[in-house]
Amino acid sequence: MAALAWLGAEHTLALGLTPVGVADAGYYRMRMAAPPLPPASADLGPFWEPSLDRLIALKPDLILMDSWSALDRATFERVAPVLPIPAYPRDASGWSFAAGQLSDLGRRLNRESVAQAALAEAERRIEALRARAQAAGAPPVYVALLAQTGRNATLYGGSGLVGGALERLGLPNAWRGPFSPSGSAVVGLDALAGEPDAVVLAIDLATTSGSFARATTGNALWRLLPSVRKRRVAALGRFYPHGGLASLLAFAEQAATAVEAARG
């Protein structure tokens, strides 16, 4: 099969299968924390314009595509059957949705026993991470991607991956305002002063080439934030807010480690 959706690629790998090709495979390898994408998976080109010729040459028996994709589904159905992969719904539990989606795909691909084993292991891991987070005092957490100007930040939470992980960890989201349907909110940087004892998980992706450093270097407002002054900041080097259960667990691991470090 081939994956034009990273969420689909992640689920496929979690089921012990290797997609013959993945859209933006190079960026996937840089940004996704788990599972690793094997070298055998070809790069199909960018999300918005995957190479149809390359896809045809790979002869996939199934194509996984984001349900919200602007790509012409009929074009790809001439290559192989297309299975839409839905995004996180607005009002669903992030954990339940990701787990249910993995289970459903396992049935679809005749990997149900593998899916059930993966779900059992995921449950074991999240409970262990919850115990660590609670032992560290369960402080409120901001999950923030700073704009390069250093004046604004995109915060994550809501019903998606981040919200699902924080809920299972028992960590309050420090941002109490509304989130978009995709689980994000754009705020002024001063909003991160709302919870003085919060831990800030600052997204610092390899794919953005040092934008975090540019946003914070010489930034007086950043230095004045209570969490920064108290050294309660940790970097998220790999983060994809629309990933599946493996991404959720990878984020939960980073969050638990960060709150432990903040406790000292």
Predicted features along the sequence, with ranges:
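Proline-aspartate-enriched helix->loop->beta-strand connector
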Residues: 52, 56-65, 192, 196-201
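Alpha-helical, coiled-coil/dimerization segments enriched in small aliphatic residues
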Residues: 26-31, 155-184
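Extracytoplasmic substrate-binding proteins
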Residues: 81-149, 241, 245-264
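Structured C-terminal subdomain patch of bacterial secreted/periplasmic proteins
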Residues: 97-100, 198-264
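A short, structured surface patch at a secondary-structure boundary
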Residues: 6-54
